[in-house]
Amino acid sequence: MAKVTDFKVADLSLAEAGRHQIRLAEYEMPGLMQLRREYAEEQPLKGARIAGSIHMTVQTAVLIETLTALGAEVRWASCNIFSTQDEAAAAIVVGDGTPEDPQGVPVFAWKGETLDEYWWCINQIFSWEGELPNMILDDGGDATMAVIRGREYEKAGVVPQPEANDSDEYIAFLGMLREVLAEEPDKWTRLADSIKGVTEETTTGVHRLYHFAEEGVLPFPAMNVNDAVTKSKFDNKYGTRHSLIDGINRATDMLMGGKNVLVCGYGDVGKGCAEAFDGQGARVRVTEADPINALQALMDGYSVVTVDEAIADADIVITATGNKDIISYEQMLKMKDHALLGNIGHFDNEIDMHSLLHRDDVIRTTIKPQVDEFTFPNGKSIIVLSEGRLLNLGNATGHPSFVMSTSFADQTIAQIELFQNEGQYENQVYRLPKILDEKVARIHVEALGGKLTELTKEQAEYIGVDVAGPFKPEHYRY
């Protein structure tokens, strides 16, 4: 392989440490390793040029090397300013080479990026020499949004100026687009024409995709990986159940037993949060807007309350809604002195971080990286993790390898599906076919030593399915 010269990571000398962790993770990621074996000769992604934007973790490193093992070329950035594991990023750049002669994949990611640096990195995954990228692998929808809004502003001939209430992140995003428009005035239009499809990892990004489709501005097919059963019911719930506690422990060493905890949101992620705290002996209450989810919480044994009535005596508050404006500045003023506030939704707008970071009468004291104390005019203070961003990735290393194996196997299969079937999908949002979802589950059942019951032909006919599956209709709720 040729020497990699186009990259930006923290420190290539970390590559050996990263490689050891990647090697161990491979044993815990049977889905990806099985796909490597199954498709080694076929090379179904040969010719794919993937612009990837997912947290640059050890588990993502195994995904990247699976994509390249199946024939793809890849450029990568993280989808969060705090989530990169620098040793994993270094190992992927070095590849089979050395720190002095790196021969891996171009990566643009390091832990602790500024917002301007973050959007610079996103731009880099689309800046290929020669041919343009033809696939996007996204988490949160930022890479996809860059192409869609970039093309829109190219057509208008101008990038709009930020408005007074725009977030710092959106201001940085517009700044990146403005610079690109000045240097390459047709870049995003050419990219939109080149991309065959996007596969999206998370709930927030899927919401964006459906919004773009409704607007009529989605320029290529999109695969909703998040709502694959082997993603949402495993990564979102069981992964969160593990990594939330890991993040809080690494950040604070706080004992959770006996504490009053408020979990905002009771979707798959919120369910994982509530179970995690319950398992630690905490007293858990839940907020929820959807009556079905609220009823589930009640039946699972949790009180369902509003933020206003519960925040004053909560020791820990966690947002997990995927929505915005969940915890306001005024509500933070009511919190217990030294209460803990964190978020495990994709973006930082669930908590009013803008007020915390920009008010002159709020004093910020950094305890350690991604752990800050904010002191209010009333003398009370709260501890905020990862500046309101994903605490499980900012304060820890995210979900464990095995559960990410299911998600990333889904991503790999979705990339193959869209890349190999160009023209068969319209510019809409699709779910991963059920038979492929079941394939991913089957691999992991076997890896855990489970033995599946095989239906007889008569049994399969009786319930109207094929002996080999799929076993459930699309509308089935697991």
Curated annotation (Swiss-Prot):
Pathway annotation: Amino-acid biosynthesis; L-homocysteine biosynthesis; L-homocysteine from S-adenosyl-L-homocysteine: step 1/1
UniProt entry tagged with the keyword Cytoplasm: yes
Cofactor(s) this protein requires: NAD(+)
Chain sites annotated for binding substrate: 57, 139, 201, 231, 235
Recorded catalytic activity of this chain's protein: S-adenosyl-L-homocysteine + H2O = L-homocysteine + adenosine
A single BP term in Gene Ontology: S-adenosylmethionine cycle
Co-factor: note: Binds 1 NAD(+) per subunit.
Localisation: Cytoplasm
Broadest EC class assigned to this enzyme: hydrolase
UniProt keyword annotations, A-Z: Cytoplasm, Hydrolase, NAD, One-carbon metabolism
UniProt keyword NAD, yes or no: yes
Documented EC number(s): 3.13.2.1
One matching Pfam family: AdoHcyase_NAD
InterPro entries referenced in this protein's UniProt entry, alphabetically: Adenosylhomocyst_ase-like_sf, Adenosylhomocysteinase-like, Ado_hCys_hydrolase_NAD-bd, NAD(P)-bd_dom_sf, S-Ado-L-homoCys_hydrolase_CS
Any one GO molecular function term: adenosylhomocysteinase activity
Binding site for NAD(+): 202-204, 236, 265-270, 288, 323, 344-346, 392
Function field: May play a key role in the regulation of the intracellular concentration of adenosylhomocysteine.
PANTHER family: ADENOSYLHOMOCYSTEINASE
UniProt family annotation: Belongs to the adenosylhomocysteinase family.
Protein name: Adenosylhomocysteinase
Organism: Corynebacterium efficiens (strain DSM 44549 / YS-314 / AJ 12310 / JCM 11189 / NBRC 100395)
